[in-house]
A protein has these predicted regions:
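Ribokinase/PfkB-type carbohydrate-kinase core domain
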Residues: 1-64, 71-80, 90-301, 353-374
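Glycine/serine-rich anion-binding loops at beta->alpha junctions
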Residues: 74-87, 313-321
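A structural signal for well-ordered alpha-helical segments within the folded catalytic domains
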Residues: 79-82, 86, 248, 324, ...
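Alpha-helix C-terminal capping segments
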Residues: 85-94, 328-333
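Conserved post-catalytic alpha-helical subdomain immediately downstream of the catalytic base
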Residues: 284, 307-373
Length: 374
């Protein structure tokens, strides 16, 4: 694909960039888990390969009982904000993180990230996540009670009041408050920023970027989702606002917004993305299905195939890595097609290597992708 070939050259021109970003607001300790199908000995087992097989195992136990062994493969930092930030830090962004990393001490799992960050404000304890990984997807089992203490008042107290928050936000090229679904007070926090921080922000020649990721809103009510969409739209007053969704989420948001796409549509995804983008009135809507990436900006729609990986080493965090690459691309003033392609490269590298790429590694991955080596 020509745009993949062109991406590596464009990235080489951007080497040595200097960008500041402020990201929050969640934090999770993730355990990556493989459910056991058959165990051969105390060291060796075969995993349950698909979600369907896992579901069958559970269904067969109805009215009876069963025992499924779970093997922890890795314990790692989790949450949309930390994984997004970790990827941006690998790229060389000067980043401040605000969120649920542990109090009074930051949990050790976050230390590799916080040691690279320009500044860190930890406001409460992290949530806990068990991520059951399969070859065709993952099941996320979350424990979120600690996140209920993260309120607008707590944010102000921990960050120097509205004035302190305004100073941090005003210095950034990109600002993001992620994981609305799992943070029960996030809408109130956004409202607080709109009411108390917006009046303090300096005027700029070009509005900075603001990135939002809902993180699977299905578990929230339609009224909550509509309120969140309205608040995200208001950020357009001071920012070029980006909403990132997966394919499932964009159809859910369309339903909540009362958008209906004709059954005769030849490209339901494109029509849905364009309609939701228009309804929200924001700068950009970006959507990442499993094998592709697309976005709507202005009156244009952009699409690319991705470097699909049939047997990934790690999938939890792939979407956040894609978001990181896309946000970096826009912050570097790449064209939208190049930005979604950088997102695909970032995610593609991550699922193959179980870690986020450096800037040079992303360039090399784009070259390998263009050469058919991935």
């Amino acid at each position: 694909m020509q745009h993949v070939k062109e991406l590596s050259a464009k990235l080489k021109e951007k080497k040595g960039f200097a960008l500041k970003m402020l990201i929050g607001l969640d934090g999770f300790v993730d355990e990556i888990i493989h459910p056991v199908d058959k165990r051969q000995d105390y060291k060796t087992f075969t995993r349950i390969k698909t979600i369907g097989e896992f579901g069958e195992r559970i269904t067969k136990a109805a009215g009876l009982s069963t025992n499924i062994e779970m093997v922890t493969i890795q314990t790692k930092l989790g949450g949309n904000g930390p994984i997004l930030s970790n990827a941006l830090l690998e790229y060389g962004v000067k980043l401040t993180y605000v969120g649920a990393l542990g109090t009074p001490d930051i949990h050790p799992v976050f230390h590799p990230m916080t040691e690279k960050a320009a500044a860190v404000y930890s406001l409460c304890n992290p949530g806990l996540t068990d991520a059951y990984e399969f070859e065709d997807g993952k099941l996320i089992m979350g424990k979120h009670s600690s996140l209920s203490s993260l309120t607008w008042e707590v944010c102000k107290k921990g960050m120097g009041g509205a004035e302190g928050i305004a100073k941090m936000v005003g210095e950034c090229h990109l600002f993001g408050m992620e994981n609305w679904t799992m943070l029960p007070h996030m809408s109130d926090i956004w409202q607080g920023i709109i009411d108390e921080v917006f009046p303090l922000l300096p005027a700029t020649a070009e509005k900075p970027l603001a990135f939002f990721d809902l993180a699977d809103p299905e578990k929230r009510t339609k009224e909550d989702i509509r309120r969140a969409m309205g608040l995200i739209g208001k950020f357009e007053q001071k920012f070029r606002t980006i909403l990132g969704l997966n394919e499932k989420e964009v159809y859910e948001i369309a339903e909540v917004l009362g958008i209906t796409i004709s059954d005769s549509s030849t490209d339901k995804l494109k029509d849905t993305v364009v309609a939701v983008h228009k309804a929200m009135g924001i700068y950009c809507l970006m959507v990442h299905p499993v094998r592709t990436v697309c976005c709507a900006i202005g009156d244009e729609y952009f699409f690319t195939e991705g470097p699909y990986c049939a047997k990934p080493k790690l999938t939890t965090g792939a979407g956040d890595n894609l978001n990181a690459g896309f946000c970096l691309g826009l912050a570097l003033n790449l064209d939208p097609l190049s930005a979604i392609t950088l997102g695909a490269c970032t995610s593609g590298y991550y699922v193959r290597n179980a870690k986020s790429p450096t800037f040079d590694q992303a360039i090399a991955f784009a070259e390998d992708w263009d050469a058919g080596k991935v």
